[in-house]
Design a protein with these regions (language model features):
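Positively charged, small/polar-rich N-terminal and surface patches that mediate targeting and assembly
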Residues: 1-127
Length: 127
């Protein structure tokens, strides 16, 4: 499983890029957090104030292990700010998944996460 934490304004770029490589299923959540940048200082009518927890997007994708590298490269390329990136661009975690069960059908494992037209079908892998 890939868990990516990205900037809010990069979500559409990342989704579009993932779709081009055949990633059809993902979960997306709005979250708040900070990393090395530690938040930002905003200025308003009443003065400036520190915002410690910044809005971010969390994307979770369950996929075959042999598709992880291509997917990570795609996320990095589409989520990075500018040519060299910036603090706050995000992180990608690669995690093991012990088992997947599709609730509707009871399918398990790889069959539970395959979609018509997805990355595995594009690579010629069948159910």
């Amino acid at each position: 499983m890939i868990e990516a934490i990205i900037r809010e304004d990069k979500l559409n770029d990342v989704k579009d890029a993932l779709r081009t490589i055949g990633i059809m299923g993902m979960n997306v959540a709005e979250i708040r957090g900070h990393g090395r940048q530690g938040g930002i200082v905003l200025s308003g009518r009443s003065g400036s104030y520190q915002v410690d927890l910044l809005p971010k997007i969390q994307i979770n994708i369950v996929l075959s292990e042999d598709n992880v590298d291509e997917t990570v490269k795609t996320i990095v390329a589409s989520a990075r700010s500018g040519s060299n990136g910036e603090a706050g661009d995000g992180l990608i975690f690669i995690l093991p998944v012990d088992e997947v069960v599709r609730i509707r059908t009871g399918e398990r494992g790889h069959d539970a996460v395959m979609y018509p037209g997805d990355i595995d079908e594009r690579k010629g892998k069948k159910k």
